[in-house]
Amino acid sequence: MDAHQQVAQWLQAAERAVVFTGAGVSTESGIPDYRGTNSRGAITQSVEFDVFLASEEARFEYWQQKCRFLGELNNSGPNLGHTLLAQWEAAGKLRAVITQNIDGLHQLAGSTVVIEVHGTVREIACLECEHRYDAGAMCNQFLEADKVPSCDQCGGLLKHATISFGQSLEPEVLESATTLAQAADLFLVLGSSRLVEPANSLPGLAQEQGARVVIVNRDETPLDGTADQVFHESIGATLEAINGYLQE
């Protein structure tokens, strides 16, 4: 049996299928992998959380980076992989998407149950009162004033609602992701070459509870040896092939 057909059968039979996505899903929309380079090939250096808190200069650099990335997102959109996942959810074949991506493309494609373990670049959060703002409007304010804005509710520090290096994940978000993984009977990992803590434990948690694990990634991953099926192919093309068997 063709491997794509096998996964389609597993997906058809699953009652609690969950997908975990990483940067590889978004690179097929032309969005750079944030861990390495920007869209022009320049090396980027992320601002760590403790440095953000301590340095006004670092906060300015952080806002420049994130607002530049948000601008790049305006030239991108959901790709075939995002769209098919949204269709599978709408058809009742997929319970949720857990993602390490901060671009919000799953929601733009139509997915409604999305757990963003690293947050979203599309919102700004006050680190004091937790008030949220639209990132587009706040980036426009930042670029016009050439100054990092403060919270108009309490005067606190404002930061894009993403998880920076050294910043703790939101406990309720991690709890939701863990619960979904442990309850899954099929767990698909898409575009994640290097899962980072604590997200790297989710496929193992799913597998320990009896779930089949499927990996789709262009490069080899540390999970390949224990997965039930592995595809080193384009994510969009792989999901399209699986979807073809679902339509039969």
State where each predicted segment sits:
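Conserved catalytic core of sirtuin-type NAD+-dependent deacylases
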Residues: 1-248
